[in-house]
Amino acid sequence: MPDISLKVLSNEIKISIQELIKELSIIGITKTEDNYINVLEKNILLKHLESKKKYSLDTLVLQRKTRSTLRISTVGGKNKSVQVEVRKKRAYVKNNKFENESFLNEKKVIKHSMQKTSSLKNKEKKYIKNIEKIELNKSDSRSLNTKKENKLKISNKDEQNKKFNQHRESNSFDLNHKKRIKENKDIRISHKEEKQDYHLTTFLHARQAEDENDREVEIDKRNHGRILKNYRQKKNNKNFHNGRYNKEEIRTFNRNKKNSKQKNKPILLQQVFQKPESIINRDVIISNTITVSDLANKMAIKSSEVIKNMMNMGIIGTINHVLDQDTAQLIAEEMGHKVIVHRENALEELIMKDRDTGNDVSAIRAPVVTIMGHVDHGKTSLLDYIRSTKTAFYEAGGITQNIGAYHVKTDLGSITFLDTPGHSAFTAMRSRGVQITDIVILVVAADDGVMPQTIEAIQHAKEANVPVIVAINKIDKTDSDIDKVRNDLMKYNILSEEWGGENIFVSVSAKTGKGINKLLNVILLQAEMLELKAVTTGMAEGIVVESFLDKGRGPIATVLVKKGQLKKGDVILCGFEYGRIKSLRDASGNEVFSAGPSIPVEVLGLSKVPFSGDVVTVVRDEKKAREVASYRKEKSREKKLSNQNRINLENMFDDINKNNVSELKIILKSDVQGSLEAISGALLKLSTEEVKIKIIGLGIGGITETDASLALASNAIILGFNVRADTSAKKIINSEHLDLRYYSVIYDLLDEVKAAMTGLLSPEYKENIIGLAEVRNTFKSPKFGLIAGCMVTEGVIKRSNPIHILRNNIVIYEGELESLRRFKEDVNEIRNGLECGIGIKNYNDIRVGDIIEVFEVREMKRIL
């Protein structure tokens, strides 16, 4: 067939050329008015137009949504509700011709079915008449048997013949019944098919069609069941017809009742709950703790039943009573259920087992050496000389305030150094440094000797069972005394090998470099004796030495690898945090792709800043790592809440006394995690019985607008350690005149907080006696009552000051003067050796010989 132009095709299908071009563009064929179309493109276009006509204006599409909730049990044993939505879509087409044809066909089918049902009813009537005749014959035979015994055999034969006929008729009834059921089914099927066609053609009867189908199904089921039941009763029971007639009479009697209309209505099927005949045994998942109500829900019984069972076992509780795992298991098993004990840390154990630990072949690793000692004894300077750097020169105040990890490669071998702070506030930091180290270098200044932090470092080393090498520093000074240092260390069981001990002593100078090579040789010799080895392949494990928040890069942790290979892109789990490693940098700031055992690296990619000392573990799945981290965080929170003091009589009185205690509220921000822990611990130790330090907020990084708003709401001071406030925070601080202080040395911070606490102390009041007067005589005054005539024996008697009245050196009254006169004139003060008259306010029991003591109260400032 030749190609057709678009104009001819538009005339054929009666569509304008513009619409035709649009339809062609929809199916991906681009044409213009002057173009031609081939046969294949024409067929595709016609199919497209037919499908478009399928849902025309005479078609109505209905959508129905049904929503329901489904409760399922999760892995943790808790019930979880899931929303289920079922969507149905139906299209109803309106076609008058098809509707009329289907309506006529339906009428024919109904007439045909009515004729068949009338013929069936006539057959049933004939069958009933035959049965009545048989029953009458049976009664006649019984009467003949009583009168004539000789005709018994004949009557038996007649009965057998009748039974045979009856059996034959029953068989014919069975066949007729089966035919009738088939015919009804055929009628019903044809009727349904016609009705389906009918209902598809019209929208007005759409819902009625569904209801009619349901009703007919129910009626057919009941009729079918009734016919089968009647046939079985007829077959097995001789009195079937009498019972049937009685039932029909009962049925006709019931029809005359008031509610007969409701009873004759067809009843649709309804879902009815049926109580189980026996107890259903369920699988009950029990966690570490569970309440009685939750346990009852999991066993699908009432809470009262669980409480009854508990009382039988000797446990008294309510629905909110919390049961431990063992008790809940006993209760559930007692009630016949199977218990599945759920371990909350099962996911953590699973994720730790699913790790590639390498080939378990150990190799020699570099020793981890921690440098410890007192403040300003030259620890960082010694390390700077070894590394050829000037770290101590740039440190604030010339003191180290966080742990620094460095890997040094020398001609003799590789060594990893950890530089710890020497200040007393950094005790926890030093203890953490000892726990991850192999060798401790105890630096003691030759001119200063053994100091408190030196003793503390010795104790930490002994607790960790780590060998100690003593480096006596500053030997280049003129006032250095090496023998004195040896004697002082001997008191703490640190003996040199020369004196028969186990510790190696090396005299060094961090300034000139004297003895440094010998110290490195001793370290490597000690490491060789310890035979330090680690697995160098597989997933890595390490420990966080220090962590901080970088403004540009985010949370950063300094990690010391213990075993395995830490690589870029690994998923790590670190305490309460997790993440994928984005970058690895060594101590010099150079980016590396992997790090082996005893190598410290800076890790970038964690969700938040971890705590120093947290264990870093490489895992496979980031999603599971997030779940374990959130589980750890939740358990830590629950532990904190459980450790809070419960209300009892003792702490109730403590809370009452707290009203007399002043609080200094502090918001603390630091640059690194270790310094934050050290400062917060030192501040809390400053608390006294009268002034308490309350840290309401602490964190790593700069001071933000949130910190300033919190300080404004809680009336707190803001302390920044090596951090600064941003622009938005400065606006709030300046406008609200908040107290913001910056520090770079921990000494200054602690001293100023002590001064602030001193200002919060309540002042002391001291009584200072300024004068004594002896009562010589008493007389009455109409205005002031009893007046004491006195002689001033010491000091000065002032009118405005308070007084004590002493009798036999015992204070019997404390009050104030009401009048002070000399020669009937009011005066303000009377000096020593003069007489005066004194009137005491609200006191008339003054006697001769009493001593009036005049004093003044002075306010004294207190010091912590």
UniProtKB/Swiss-Prot annotation:
Single GO MF annotation: translation initiation factor activity
Record-linked InterPro entries: DNA-bd_dom_put_sf (IPR009061), EF-G-like_DII (IPR053905), EFTu-like_2 (IPR004161), IF2_assoc_dom_bac (IPR013575), IF2_II (IPR044145), IF2_N (IPR006847), P-loop_NTPase (IPR027417), Small_GTP-bd (IPR005225)
Subcellular location: Cytoplasm
Region (Disordered) residue spans: 140-179
PROSITE patterns to which the protein is assigned, alphabetical: G_TR_2, IF2
Region ranges (G4): 473-476
Residue numbers binding GTP: 373-380, 419-423, 473-476
G3: region residues: 419-422
GO CC annotations on file: cytosol
Record family assignment: Belongs to the TRAFAC class translation factor GTPase superfamily. Classic translation factor GTPase family. IF-2 subfamily.
Role of this protein: One of the essential components for the initiation of protein synthesis. Protects formylmethionyl-tRNA from spontaneous hydrolysis and promotes its binding to the 30S ribosomal subunits. Also involved in the hydrolysis of GTP during the formation of the 70S ribosomal complex.
Protein's recorded name: Translation initiation factor IF-2
Organism: Buchnera aphidicola subsp. Acyrthosiphon pisum (strain Tuc7)
Phylogenetic lineage: Bacteria, Pseudomonadati, Pseudomonadota, Gammaproteobacteria, Enterobacterales
Gene that encodes it: infB
